Amino acid sequence: MSETKLDALRRHTIIVADSGDIDAIRSFAPQDCTTNPSLILKAAKMPAYAGLIAQAIEAGSAEAGPSEGLIDRILDHLAVTFGSELARIVPGVVSTEVDARLSFDTQATVARAERLIGLYAARGVAAERILIKVAATWEGIRAVEILQSRGIACNVTLVFSLAQAVAAAEAGAFLISPFVGRILDWHVKASGKSFDIDEDPGVRSVTEIYTYFKHFGYKTIVMGASFRSSAEVEALCGCDRLTVSPALLDQLRSQTGDVPKRLDPAASKAATISRLAVDEASFRWQINEDALATEKLAEGIRLFNADTDALRRTIAETLAKRASTVA
């Protein structure tokens, strides 16, 4: 029997499942799993996971704290409830995201991350099994620097530029997630044209970041994310890790054939590359001059916050129904 493309990819790259759907993840046996508010919201709407929602509400309601913070406490428990279930399935790490509203507050991000790790510990999930996802703002990256120094590994997300990637690596981030598909989306909208896979701006961006990291010897893992097609996934074969949706994993599993390695550390070492300055002033200037990074970073934070707000409404409605039933 011929090798599937998914198996061929696995010879060169660690495959990660990008989903909160526990049953879907179980079927692909990935090494790791990533979640975000959008994926948790999608999973929370599935009847199969109503029990996990109830667990989170019970845990959050039982926790001491002011009434105005109840829904946020429940949200933390919801993320950890899903993450703990995922940690039972994958042998590696599970990424859990910090509230998007904290993207510009270093100390609040650190505090929330430490709280999430504590909630995981209470469920018997060790800190080394968890990556805390933090948006690639300057403040977020500073939080990552603090968290990494305290032994909490981080996944820097919403990476759309080399400046963000390098700043995260210099802060000691365990892993970064450059967003392939959203970069492509921006260029398609801006130019009004389509791109062949060899010209795909998202693929090129991840390739540039990977090459830079390997050339200068950064230990930070590059994990391509946000794919629009299986062709994009194949085009980044050899990247440290790739986090892929169940739909695209299914496509790759249903196709046979070789997937050639495209990214190679040895070739990256031989490349001619200049170092990039990423102090605060230069970081902010480079993001300011990069319309794609500016727009997509802001949009990504807004979208994650919108989905978190949708989760808040769902929880509030559930709490109201419970209160009316008791009354």
Swiss-Prot record:
Catalytic activity, reaction form: D-sedoheptulose 7-phosphate + D-glyceraldehyde 3-phosphate = D-erythrose 4-phosphate + beta-D-fructose 6-phosphate
Subcellular location: Cytoplasm
Pfam families noted in UniProt: TAL_FSA (PF00923)
Stored PROSITE patterns: TRANSALDOLASE_1 (PS01054), TRANSALDOLASE_2 (PS00958)
Main localization (coarse): cytoplasm
EC class of the enzyme, as a word: transferase
Keyword Transferase in annotation: yes
A GO MF term: transaldolase activity
Pathway: Carbohydrate degradation; pentose phosphate pathway; D-glyceraldehyde 3-phosphate and beta-D-fructose 6-phosphate from D-ribose 5-phosphate and D-xylulose 5-phosphate (non-oxidative stage): step 2/3
GO biological process entries: carbohydrate metabolic process; pentose-phosphate shunt
SUPFAM superfamilies, per the entry: Aldolase
Cytoplasm is among the record's keywords: yes
Active site: K133
Catalytic activity, EC: 2.2.1.2
Keywords in alphabetical order: Cytoplasm, Pentose shunt, Schiff base, Transferase
One of the record's GO cellular component terms: cytoplasm
Protein role: Transaldolase is important for the balance of metabolites in the pentose-phosphate pathway.
Assembly: Homodimer.
NCBIfam families (alphabetical): talAB (TIGR00874)
Family assignment from sequence similarity: Belongs to the transaldolase family. Type 1 subfamily.
Protein name: Transaldolase
Organism: Rhodospirillum rubrum (strain ATCC 11170 / ATH 1.1.1 / DSM 467 / LMG 4362 / NCIMB 8255 / S1)
Gene name in the database record: tal
